Amino acid sequence: MNNNRINIILNGKNVKAQEGERLVEIIQRHNIPLSAPCYHRSLTETGHCGLCLVGARRKVTDKFSVVFACTATAKDGMEIDTEYKEAVDKRNELFRLHLLRHPLDCSKCNKVGYCFLHKFASQTRFPGFTRIAKDHPQDIKYKKFGQHILFDATKCIGCQRCIRFCRDVLDEELLGLIGNENGYGEIDLYPGKSLDNNYSLNLVDLCPAGAFVNRNYLYQPVEWNLISTPSISTESSVGINTYVLHKGNKIFRIKPRENKYVNDAWMTNSARNEHRYFENRKRLTKIMQNGQQVPLESALLQIVESFQTNELAVVCSGNMSLEDQFVLRKLLDSIIHNVFFLRKKMTPDGFLISDDATPNVNGAILNKITTQEKIVDDLKELTEKIQTGQCKRILSFNEEIFSHGVPYALPDDLKIFYIGTENNKTSKRAMVAIPVTTVFENTGTFINRDWRLQKFHKAVNPPNGNIFPMWYIFSLLLSVYLDVSKKELLWLDDVWKNMTHTVDVLADIDFFHVNPGGILLKNYLK
């Protein structure tokens, strides 16, 4: 497809399009109902289902012919008619065949509310939708295709999206089409193959009719009954765009949010379980001082006292949001300190997992908390400073220092202060521990590995009212330390406004309305 703009006629109206653009994309862009279950922008086109048939002609003087909207491309002067009678009749006949094979168990189907068959019937007011398949057996017989994937052949419409995903995206031949006893083609695994890779659950999202099921969601609320909130995965610096699906302050699942610049329409299986990480680990929910619960003011005063010494070490990583890092930078400018910025390594897969297991290292570099050269792999240098008496205070921001080289046996005069989400060894050893919100309980931004600024939104509330965002705690610490009566940066709006006024790269960015696809900061960086 090239960038030449052309004129075409769509259902009697003159519209603009790009030369070589798929007809189905033009039709959908103009909000004209047309089902194309086998078509996906990120997969090779095939025309398997035949439900996107439309009438088209090269010139007004030509006769209409029936074409597949998912494979046919736009040419200057072309006329398209989605209501061309011959095309409509063929679409309806093919749709009727799909319904004859499809079970009417919509109330139990995990795709309810998002099923292409239901949507097509509703849009076209297809007659007899609830009667055609009345005698179809209702027993669900799942095939196990992998550790997390179940397959219900009775719901399969033969679109072959799953086959093309494995071939086009995973570059593997895992699924194929075989004949069954009813004379229909049926999806099945190749001998010796299984869907146990880290991207297999994308088939559940891809399937338009609910044939693929995530076995973990079999007995959970269906998607249409959940609230969907845009977010960003913290699994790695890729910054996969996601939707967090929740209800009643509980997260039930995470699914991919399409962004052609970052993750296309896909995500890893491991990123879908990020909310379980916080559920399965002990959460820090109380403000603690020497093992006793205390008011926030008391804990802040204890931490501020540590700012008076030049023997203070700050431990952090790219797990913090851009807002956290911005206010932290203001705090660090006021105190004498040594910063140990940790690199969190992981094994990259060459696709949606990078070698950096944190979402916002570039944000720390932008806020001048660290540089690429100063990032450390462990805390051996900090351990040496502790042993030689050069470090008497450690301020850890959501970091488990004992898993990065610091011995648990420490001098009696060493004091640890912890601000984070987990009730771990560091928080238990700390003189003061203050809980903060997770990415699911907060609104903010990350800068991914490609310097794309991306926004995440608050989905659920923290466990109690005494848990605040990390940037808010930093703002309070700054106010207490500077002993100012007028507290600043206590609202997210104030933080965003300060960022645009202080950081040149962010000067023209409206944080209140960040594009869902993000903003590429490389265009701003010199």
Q: Predicted segment positions?
A:
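Glycine-rich phosphate/diphosphate-binding loops that line cofactor/substrate pockets in enzymes
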Residues: 299-313, 382-392
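Gly/Ser/Thr-rich loops at beta-strand to alpha-helix junctions
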Residues: 313-324, 400-402
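Long, low-complexity segments enriched in small/aliphatic residues
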Residues: 496-526
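Non-catalytic alpha/beta scaffold blocks inside enzyme catalytic domains
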Residues: 331, 335-508
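Cofactor-/ligand-binding subdomain signature composed of acidic, glycine-rich
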Residues: 135, 245-310, 352-353, 357-365, ...
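Fe-S ferredoxin-like electron-transfer domains
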Residues: 50-233, 238-242, 250
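Phosphate/diphosphate-binding loops
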Residues: 198-256, 398-400, 407-424, 459-475
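N-terminal cofactor/phosphate-binding cores enriched in small/glycine residues
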Residues: 6, 11-76, 85-90
